[in-house]
Design a protein with these regions (language model features):
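Short, small-residue-biased leader/transition segments that mark boundaries at the very start
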Residues: 1-4
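Surface-exposed loop/edge segments in extracytoplasmic proteins
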Residues: 6-11, 43, 180-185
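Aromatic sugar-binding surface patches on proteins
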Residues: 10-20, 194-198
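Surface-exposed, short loops/turns at beta-strand junctions within beta-sandwich domains
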Residues: 22-28, 205-207
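Short glycine/proline/serine/threonine-rich loop/turn segments at secondary-structure transition edges
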Residues: 25-31, 151-155
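Short, aromatic- and glycine-rich surface loops/edge beta-strands on solvent-exposed regions
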Residues: 29-38, 211-216
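Edge beta-strands of extracellular beta-sandwich domains
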Residues: 40-54
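Compositionally biased, intrinsically disordered or flexible polar/acidic segments
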Residues: 50-233
Length: 233
């Protein structure tokens, strides 16, 4: 079997059934072991973690097989039970790296339909201006995640029907990448419905040193729930 070098991460207090440890992974498949005490009995569990490190400077290394997924509008990691892909916490853009441009975090506790990744769609960046990745030339797949949650604040109008529905559908915006328009007037609520998950995928040929995604308000607000960048070749 596999042989692992043990390294203790110390002890942490449990708060609301959660204990947080900082684990400095040094291999691509580390084994995490946890041990505790329950009613006088020692209990333990373990899991082998599969991960690919993402460099801060995306131009500093070869990005073959890069798959960078971001939990937009959230400071939390999220791992999908379906794909097992981990979505990283959001961050502001800095030169040479990646991140959002403009907007504010917003979240909802309303159940999101048409997805098994509800928590991923319950956070967003409202009023977002753009998202940028400073990556080498190549062909990339960009996936954008949307859920119109804004009728939560118009609950009475929404329950009454058409008036609330119309207010949400006013959230319409365009999307461009490196100056080229991909969507003229995208309305997530019109396409998928209120609090319904929607994913959009685009193949981008990047002939510069960056992928600069911009959102252009047509009516209402621009928002983004998640984004994934995958290097194709």
């Amino acid at each position: 079997g596999d042989v692992y070098k043990r390294q203790s991460l110390g002890r942490q207090q449990v708060d609301n059934y959660t204990a947080i440890f900082k684990a400095p992974f040094s291999s691509k498949e580390p084994l995490l072991l946890v041990q505790g005490n329950y009613q006088g009995t020692t209990v333990q569990d373990g899991i082998k973690v599969h991960f690919t490190p993402i460099p801060t400077n995306l131009n500093s290394t070869g990005l073959k097989d890069l798959e960078l997924a971001v939990n937009v509008g959230s400071q939390c990691f999220y791992t999908s039970d379906e794909s097992l892909l981990t979505w990283l916490p959001d961050q502001p853009y800095t030169k040479g790296s990646w991140g959002y441009i403009g907007g504010k975090e917003l979240s909802t506790q309303t159940e999101i339909r048409r997805t098994a990744d509800g928590p991923l769609f319950q956070t967003l960046r409202n009023g977002i201006e753009g998202y940028r990745f400073d990556v080498p030339r190549g062909v990339y797949e960009v996936e954008l995640l949307f859920t119109d949650i804004f009728l939560q604040n118009e609950g009475i109008a929404y329950q009454l029907g058409r008036e609330g529905e119309q207010k949400s559908r006013e959230n319409t915006f365009g999307i461009s990448v490196n100056g080229k328009m991909l969507e003229e007037k995208l309305s997530p609520c019109k396409e998928s419905g209120y609090c319904q998950a929607m994913r959009k995928k685009y193949i981008i040929t990047n002939d510069t040193d960056h992928i600069d995604i911009r959102f252009h308000p047509a009516s209402g607000t621009c928002f983004l729930n998640g984004i994934k960048l995958r290097n194709i070749h």
